[in-house]
Amino acid sequence: MGVAFDKCETRPANIDAILSGLDRYNPETTTIFQDYVVQQCEDRTFDCYANLALLKLYQFNPHLLQAETVTNILAKALTVFPSPAFSLCLSLLPAHTQPFPSNTEAQAASQTSDFVESVQKLARLSTLLESAQYAQFWSTLNSDDLYADLTADVAGFEELVRIRIAVEVGKAFREINAEVLEQWLDLRSREALEKFVAEVCSWEVDKSGPNGTVVKVPTNKENEVRSEVKSERVGVEMFGRVIRRGFEQAA
C-alpha cells in the first residue's frame, strides 16, 4: 500500500503538529516551514504536503514570499518526478510566474523578474522530464549557469534525478542500448555507466550482442510482456429482458 499524500515518514513532529491544526494558516509559521525546506534540501527528503502548505501561506501573504525558498521547493519537486508534485507547487504561484502567462499584464511582469525567469526555467526542466526527453533535459540543465544556481542548494540533485530516470527506464525496457542510456543518465563514460547500473540498479551489462553493448533490465511487473485475454459471459436472461422490453407498450 502506498503512503498517503499528506504523510511523510521523515516529517518532524513539530511540522506534523502544525499541518494537523489551524496553525498551518498562521503566517507566523512561515519561517518554520522555510527552515524545513532547507532541511529537506540538505538531507535529500521531500515533503510535498508541507511544501504546499508553505506555498499556500505565500499565496495568502505575498509579502512573505522568499524567491529562493520557492525555487528550492520546485527544484526538489523535480527529484520526485513523475509525481504531480511539481505541477501542484507551480499551481500555487502567482499567475505572472506561469510558463504561459494568460494576459498582457502578466506577460509584462514576467519579462522583468529574475524570479519569474527562474520559475519558468525550472518548469522547462519539468516538461522535459515528464515527456521523457532525458537527453535534452541534461543538455538544457548544462546549458546555462542559472540552472546550476537554481539546483545548488539541493544536495545530490543530479544523482536523485538520475535514479528517477533509471526507475522509469526500468518500467519500460527489458533491454536498452548502452550509448542511449549514457545520454539519458548523463554518464560521460562507459565505466561510469557500468558502475551505476550495477551498483544502483542491479542491472546487467551485456557486451556480447551483435548490436553492441546493451543493458539488460530484470523482469518486473511493469516491463513484463503479458498476453491479456478478456472474456465476457452473457446469460440468456439478459437477452430475455431485452426481448420483453421490445414487446412492452409505451405508457
UniProtKB/Swiss-Prot annotation:
Annotated family: Belongs to the eIF-3 subunit K family.
Record-linked InterPro entries: ARM-type_fold, CSN8_PSD8_EIF3K, eIF3k, PCI_dom, Transl_init_fac_sub12_N_euk, WH-like_DNA-bd_sf, WH_DNA-bd_sf
UniProt protein name: Eukaryotic translation initiation factor 3 subunit K
Coiled coil region boundaries: none
Alphabetized Pfam families for the sequence: CSN8_PSD8_EIF3K (PF10075)
Record GO biological process: formation of cytoplasmic translation initiation complex; regulation of translational initiation
Gene3D superfamilies given in the database record: ARM repeat, domain 1, Winged helix-like DNA-binding domain superfamily/Winged helix DNA-binding domain
Highest taxon listed in the record's lineage: Eukaryota
Function of the molecule: Component of the eukaryotic translation initiation factor 3 (eIF-3) complex, which is involved in protein synthesis of a specialized repertoire of mRNAs and, together with other initiation factors, stimulates binding of mRNA and methionyl-tRNAi to the 40S ribosome. The eIF-3 complex specifically targets and initiates translation of a subset of mRNAs involved in cell proliferation.
Subcellular location: Cytoplasm
CC per GO annotation: eukaryotic 43S preinitiation complex; eukaryotic 48S preinitiation complex; eukaryotic translation initiation factor 3 complex
GO molecular function, one term: translation initiation factor activity
Cytoplasm is among the record's keywords: yes
HAMAP family reported for this sequence: eIF3k (MF_03010)
First-listed, main subcellular location of the protein, grouped into a coarse class: cytoplasm
Domain PCI: 46-224
Summary of subunit composition and partner proteins: Component of the eukaryotic translation initiation factor 3 (eIF-3) complex.
Record key words, sorted: Cytoplasm, Initiation factor, Protein biosynthesis
